[in-house]
Amino acid sequence: MAENESNVVVDHGQSRLSDLWTKEDYWAIWLGFVILIAGMWLFLANPSPEFAQKVDKANAVMAAEAERAPFKTLAYYKAQDDKGKLKAMDSATGKSIGAFLKAPGGWTSNPLESFVLSKEAAEERNAAAKSKFEAAKAKSDAAFAAAQVAEAAAAEAGFADTALNDAAQGKIAEWRADLAKMKSAEKKVKTKAFNISTSLPMLMVVMGLFFAIGMKFMGHDVPKFLVGFIGVFVVAVIAQMMGHQSTMKYWGIGTEAWAIIIGMLIANTVGTPNFIKPALQVEYYIKTGLVLLGAEVLFDKIIAIGIPGIFVAWVVTPIVLICTFIFGQKILKMPSKTLNMVISADMSVCGTSAAIATAAACRAKKEELTLSIGLSLVFTAIMMIVMPAFIKSVGMPQILGGAWMGGTIDATGAVAAAGAFLGEKALYVAATIKMIQNVLIGVVAFGVAVYWCARVECTSGRSVGWIEIWNRFPKFVLGFLTASIIFSIISGSLGSDMSQIMVNQGVLKGLSSPLRGWFFCLAFTAIGLATNFRELAHYFKGGKPLILYVCGQSFNLVLTLTMAYIMFYIVFPEITAKI
C-alpha cells in the first residue's frame, strides 16, 4: 500500500478474536459501557419514592385540567413545571459527581474566575443581575395575572366560547414566554462560589488512568501516554476556559473550536512537544464519547414527535449526503473521494460525530478529517446565530423553525442553543430531530463501508464479501447502537416521566454527558496539536472543500425547510397541533 497507514483514521487489518482487547474501537466500547453501567448503578439502583408520588400527583392535575378545558391551562402548566424540577442528579451523590466533573465556568474579563469564584465575587455577580431579574419577574407576574383573568373568563363561559378560549391561550402563551425569560434571568442571580483548582488535577489523573487501561492492552507505552496526557488535558482546560468566555459564547465560538485553534497554534508555531505526542489519541477519545452519545438516542423520543420528524431527519439527510457527494465528484471534480465523503457526511448528518464514523469507514486521512471538522465548526457557529435571528425576523412558526434548525445545524449542543432562542416548542422539536438524525451515524458508516468496498476500492472481476465489509466497518458504531437500544429499553420500561427524571436527568446529564463533553474536548485538542498547516494547504486548492460545504449546506437548508413545512403543516397538521 502506498499510503502510510499511520496517516489513516483506521488502519487496514483482518479481524481476530484478540481485537476485542487490542483494538481501539473495542476499547472505546468497553470504556463507554463502564461509564454507562456506573451511571445506572448510581442513579437507577435506588430511586427516591418521592419521585413517583410527585409525578402521580402532577399527572392527576394535568389529566383533570385536560378534561376540564380544551387547551393547556395555568394549572396544567404549573403541574408540568413541578415535574420538570424533579432530577435524579440533584441527589447528594449526583451533586458530588457534578462538582468533580465540573469544567471551567463562565467569565467576562478575568479568566481566573473560570476556575475560582469567591463568595464576594459571586454575590457581586448576583447583585449586578438583580435588577434585570426583578424586571423580568415583574413582567412574568403581570403576564400570569393577565392569563388568570383571561382563563377565568373562558371558564365562566364553560370553555364554549371560541374567542374567549383563543384569548386565554394567547395570554397563557405570553406568560410562558415571559416565564422562560424570567427563569433565564433568575439563573444569573443564583451564582454560587466554586473552586475547581483542586478537582481539575484529580479529574486529569482519573481520566488519564481510565484511558491508560486500554492503552496498556493495545501495546502502547503507558508511562509516556500518561505524561503526554497532562499536556493534552492542560490545553483542553484552556480551551474550556476560552469557550466559556461571555463574548466567545455569545458568538458561538465554543470549546471545540478553541481546542482546535489553540492546538493548531501550538503545533504550527513552537511545535507540539514530543512528550505530548503519545497522548494525541484522537479517535480513542472521540469514539469513547460517541459510544456515550448512543445512550442519548432514545427511541421513545423519536416516536413521540412522530412521522414528520422522521421524514425530516431520515429522508432529507441521505438525499443531501448522496447529492453532495455526487456534486463534489462530477461537478467540482474533487481530487480526494474520501475528503468529499467526509465533508458530505459531516454537513448532512450531524457534524463531527458523523465525520469520525465516515472517516473510519472510508479510510480518510487524518488531515481530511481535521479539515472537515474545521469547516463544520465554523459554519455551526454562524448558523446557530443567524438562523434563529432570521426565523424570528420573518415570523416563522416555532415548530417549523425548530425542525429546520434541527435538520441543518451540525452540532447537537448548537441546535439546542439555537432552539432555546426561539422558545420551548422550537427547542423540543429541534433537539428531537437532531437526536433522530444521530441514529443515522451507524447507518451511514455501514453504507459508506459497503460502497467503498464494492465501488471505490474494488478489484475488477472480484466480488466483495461480507468479511471485507466487516473489516472496514468502524466497530465502535456497534457500541453506539447497543447503548441506544439498551437505554431505549430502560427508558421505555420506566415510562416517559420517570425516564426523564432517572435517565435523562440522572445517568445522562449527571454523568455520561459531562464526560462526553470532556472526551470530545480532548479529541479536538489532539486534532489541533497533530495538525500541520502545510499538510492541509493542498486540500484547499481552488477552494473546492469550502465550495462543496457551502453548496451542500445550501441544498440542505432548502430541502429541509421544504420537507418540514410539508410534513408538519400539510400532511400531518394534527401532530403539529399536539406539540
Swiss-Prot record:
Keywords: Cell membrane, Membrane, Transmembrane, Transmembrane helix. It comes from the Bacteria. InterPro entries: UPF0324_pro. Pfam families: Cons_hypoth698 (PF03601). It is found in: Cell membrane. The keyword Cell membrane applies. The chain crosses the membrane at residues 26-45, 193-215, 225-243, 250-272, 305-327, 369-391, 430-452, 473-495, 515-533, 546-568. It is a multi-pass membrane protein. The keyword Transmembrane applies. GO terms for cellular component: plasma membrane. Belongs to the UPF0324 family. PANTHER family: INNER MEMBRANE PROTEIN YEIH-RELATED, UPF0324 MEMBRANE PROTEIN FN0533. This is UPF0324 membrane protein DVU_0943. It comes from Nitratidesulfovibrio vulgaris (strain ATCC 29579 / DSM 644 / CCUG 34227 / NCIMB 8303 / VKM B-1760 / Hildenborough).
